[in-house]
Amino acid sequence: MQVPFSVEARAVSLQEARSLYFGRGELPEALLDQNVLRSWERCRQAGLDPARLGGGEPDVRGVAEARERNRTLISHAQPVLEHLFEQIRNSHSMVILADARGMVLQSYGDADFLSRAEQVALRPGASWHEFERGTNAIGTALAERGAVNVFGSEHFFEGNAFLTCSASPIQDAQGRLMGVLDISSDYRAFQRHSLGLVKMSSRIIEKRLFESEFAHQGLLSFHARPDHVGSLCEALLAISPDGDLLGADQAALELLGLRREDLPRRHYSMLFDVPLGTLIDRARRDPSSLIAISGRNGERFYARLRGNFAPMSAAASALVDARGERLAGRPRQEAPVPAPADRLT
């Protein structure tokens, strides 16, 4: 869909979309992003009235309990929220952290915008689940399990049409929804880069959560581009000393063509050609260096292993890789020959 560039043109096209949808019962597919249209459909099926005020007052007691339930999320997200707000300060905006139920846990914002946001209960303790507040970035990001923009009159409730919001979900190391990061502002202050900012910031939080959960395991950082290892673009695998896969972030699943449910049936040696012992030895000798490895389907990656692995002998390395072959249901083969020196960078 080609979205008009100007705020004014977009506002006009959204009034046309609302007229078609709410006035004539037609689907304005050419005028709305599909995630917004799906949200409108969910809200209508739930019996929400676009003319009413959404939800109730913030739950002071409930937010205290929610913060306790989500203390791990908050501890890793707090510095990211503060840094993100510094980037958008003085732009008539606010930064919001909500939990997996859509309850606002924390917020930072410019005073002039916060006072207006409070008029629609966009503050800690309020639920912004779709069935409470209609289409909105927090609730819709949770429902869609993906990053979304909700601009002006794309909000289901007319009273929220002064907002423009960008939100990205936050997942834990097992792929479960933990919460949502959101930037909200007056729609007239719309910034195209807001969605990119929340996606990047949510990725930072997810990376912190993953590394914290597997802090005492081996962490394999890898990517097809060597300059992406150590950046937000890197993929992460958590590996036991025996080569079992303990966890994978979304980037790792995508690069390796795996589903999360595949992990318990996979072993390090089923994915890469370089023996785990070689990686461990390299990590002990030169922790900052990269090693070139190939996937079992021929993909070329660059990797760095972190963790407190004990030194592994060649015999132990062969046993680990042989165990992986047995898990794969294949006959035992000779242990892979370590990569030649010119592949180690």
Identify the residue ranges that each predicted region occupies.
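Sensory coupling linkers of modular signal transduction proteins
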Residues: 181-214, 229, 303-345
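PAS-family sensory/regulatory modules and their coupling/dimerization elements
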Residues: 153-154, 162-167, 272-333
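Surface loops and adjacent helix of pleckstrin homology
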Residues: 107-109, 153, 210, 248-250, ...
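Short linear motifs in intrinsically disordered
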Residues: 85-86, 226-229, 270, 277-284
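Short, solvent-exposed coil/turn linker segments
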Residues: 60, 126-130, 186, 259, ...
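Short, surface-exposed beta-strand-loop junctions and turns on beta-sheet-rich folds
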Residues: 111-113, 252-255, 309-310
